[in-house]
């Protein structure tokens, strides 16, 4: 099987692409894969480290309105389409997969023009502009959220697959995770994080939560500040009875390397609402308090969060409305209402798609004429 996978710009596009590549290799060890990105995105650092062959083409995103920047982007897109057409001729893929980012534009379009089967995958509840445009030409359009379907043209051939979740998270079990972390079965475990770089607003709002639950024998609280927020957060704990190292029931760190175990052990999670995070929460059936990143493209994180909150799987707090006392009240309300928490857990689990990767691989195999396992 010969497959080109394109996706770039951010980790949200790159990691799903890598998960798909790994899945193809597991099913078809002799498959020829080629990852296509740009020379400017994170993919230039991430992909080569995986051992996947990497090829860069010219590509750039368009902004609204007329500007010299847009003119340059159009010219670069034209060069990217030419490079992609040439690449299709040389590599001769059976299927081309796009996971988002403007690099997918010329790559998927070139494949469609050459009559090559294509699959695009949309991670968010509000699709990006590139995927909305490409869905007119793609053989199939896979979506993570059912809400995304209404934003695509009527002619798009949409399949609800979900978003691939890392095996170490899918395979985690509550009892094993708690045993590994030394957490008693009866403890209420609260996990909060704002992503690898953290979230200042979330860090600030967590102070009253730390104050309220410090040294509480029935609670274990884990808060990741992000690398940029740790030094700022640590002094804020002074006078709270806690420190950056924290008392026994509270752990504050820039980043948790054992996030899979922590998710497995958690009763409630406070976090942003990126697509990958949502996929992990729902795969494990975790209740959550979601605070969408307000500057995400098209405000897509709020759309993601609403997809859960409107089905009873999460509590939504907008970043502009986030306060320490408000967050504490939301946590306390759920902590004191096990029945509500159990209902949220069930609703979250119902939204999960733990077989997302297999569903996507099945589509690729069908498009390639290989059939399924």
From Swiss-Prot:
A Pfam match = Glyco_tran_28_C
Q: Tell me, what is an example of a GO biological process annotation in this record?
A: peptidoglycan biosynthetic process
Catalytic activity line of the entry = di-trans,octa-cis-undecaprenyl diphospho-N-acetyl-alpha-D-muramoyl-L-alanyl-D-glutamyl-meso-2,6-diaminopimeloyl-D-alanyl-D-alanine + UDP-N-acetyl-alpha-D-glucosamine = di-trans,octa-cis-undecaprenyl diphospho-[N-acetyl-alpha-D-glucosaminyl-(1->4)]-N-acetyl-alpha-D-muramoyl-L-alanyl-D-glutamyl-meso-2,6-diaminopimeloyl-D-alanyl-D-alanine + UDP + H(+)
- Report the Gene3D superfamilies cross-referenced here: Glycogen Phosphorylase B
Enzyme class comes to: transferase
Pathway(s) per entry: Cell wall biogenesis; peptidoglycan biosynthesis
InterPro entries on file: GlcNAc_MurG, Glyco_trans_28_C, GlycoTrans_28_N
Q: Which domain of life is it from?
A: Bacteria
Keyword field contains Cell wall biogenesis/degradation? yes
| EC number(s) on file | 2.4.1.227
Binding of UDP-N-acetyl-alpha-D-glucosamine occurs at: 10-12, 124, 166, 196, 301
Q: Which keywords describe this protein according to UniProt?
A: Cell cycle, Cell division, Cell membrane, Cell shape, Cell wall biogenesis/degradation, Glycosyltransferase, Membrane, Peptidoglycan synthesis, Transferase
According to its record, what are the GO cellular component terms?
plasma membrane
Compartments, record wording:
Cell membrane
Task: Classify the protein's membrane topology as the record does.
Answer: Peripheral membrane protein
Any one Gene Ontology molecular-function term assigned to this protein's record: undecaprenyldiphospho-muramoylpentapeptide beta-N-acetylglucosaminyltransferase activity
Its annotated function is as follows: Cell wall formation. Catalyzes the transfer of a GlcNAc subunit on undecaprenyl-pyrophosphoryl-MurNAc-pentapeptide (lipid intermediate I) to form undecaprenyl-pyrophosphoryl-MurNAc-(pentapeptide)GlcNAc (lipid intermediate II).
Q: To which protein family does this belong?
A: Belongs to the glycosyltransferase 28 family. MurG subfamily.
> What name does this protein carry?
UDP-N-acetylglucosamine--N-acetylmuramyl-(pentapeptide) pyrophosphoryl-undecaprenol N-acetylglucosamine transferase
